[in-house]
Curated annotation (Swiss-Prot):
Its EC number is 1.2.4.1. Keywords: Acetylation, Carbohydrate metabolism, Disease variant, Glucose metabolism, Metal-binding, Mitochondrion, Oxidoreductase, Phosphoprotein, Potassium, Pyruvate, Thiamine pyrophosphate, Transit peptide, Tricarboxylic acid cycle. It catalyses: N(6)-[(R)-lipoyl]-L-lysyl-[protein] + pyruvate + H(+) = N(6)-[(R)-S(8)-acetyldihydrolipoyl]-L-lysyl-[protein] + CO2. It comes from Homo sapiens (Human). Changing E262 to A/Q: Does not affect interaction with DLAT. The keyword NADP does not apply. Thiamine diphosphate binds at E89. One of its GO terms (molecular function) is metal ion binding. This is Pyruvate dehydrogenase E1 component subunit beta, mitochondrial. SUPFAM superfamilies: Thiamin diphosphate-binding fold (THDP-binding) (SSF52518), TK C-terminal domain-like (SSF52922).
Amino acid sequence: MAAVSGLVRRPLREVSGLLKRRFHWTAPAALQVTVRDAINQGMDEELERDEKVFLLGEEVAQYDGAYKVSRGLWKKYGDKRIIDTPISEMGFAGIAVGAAMAGLRPICEFMTFNFSMQAIDQVINSAAKTYYMSGGLQPVPIVFRGPNGASAGVAAQHSQCFAAWYGHCPGLKVVSPWNSEDAKGLIKSAIRDNNPVVVLENELMYGVPFEFPPEAQSKDFLIPIGKAKIERQGTHITVVSHSRPVGHCLEAAAVLSKEGVECEVINMRTIRPMDMETIEASVMKTNHLVTVEGGWPQFGVGAEICARIMEGPAFNFLDAPAVRVTGADVPMPYAKILEDNSIPQVKDIIFAIKKTLNI
């Protein structure tokens, strides 16, 4: 009775507020998309947008791709635009380059970039050099794509990083996506580019889901080639990486943050042309640099970054020598314990960061 009389004595507006039914709601979960599906979506949208785009490679059509990246595209676009080829990288890469010279926009899939060695003449001599050799008269709008870098248990001839190989060649653009957003935005930009673009995907990342922001779901979503992304802001040290090791760098940064060390993690996205402006600006802020890559140490991507820092304005801002974290200088072993020790792990990145900061 006391509670009821208390309500009676209160103003009507206040009583109605107390009696109003309250609803609790949870925000919808962010859309999760795997890297595989993001690439598939990007190719699908570009095939739909431009009838000059087509995909060719081993098992890309009826089998939906060795890694199911082209799943559903053959059923949607048919034999003329999703083309299964014989096991001859030199042959179908040459056909693709010729088609690009004739005005089409081929996507040439290598089952693994290790097999692109069979077609290196077509990629370098035919695709990369033609625009220059023709005095700018003959563009070659072609995409070479497929899994790159270390895989699991496939040994030396199927496990290595080609970022430095192709990044060395003028006339090529080279991109190396990490997450689903990267994968879709970069594959679409690569297909629309009038130059040959090498898209270095990662086999171990295909099935990994990432949050897919609303802007990435648009058919107009593009990531500009030649622009890096700061994945984590920091003030103590700059950590630069590409492809799968970006995730390792973020894990290392999370561990070190608990110890008071704030790492700025840069996802390169593009190997060539390299976004040195973003890297230099970060180094000028943090005064320290660590590069991380899955490739071999000699003449690698990290070595190129360090050389450019030495030659540019950021060098005078360094408080300690730059440090590289790379794969081991050996062909990829088969045994799992040796394989794990041949590519950078989170502990290796943490060690390098602490070494650079002298902590």
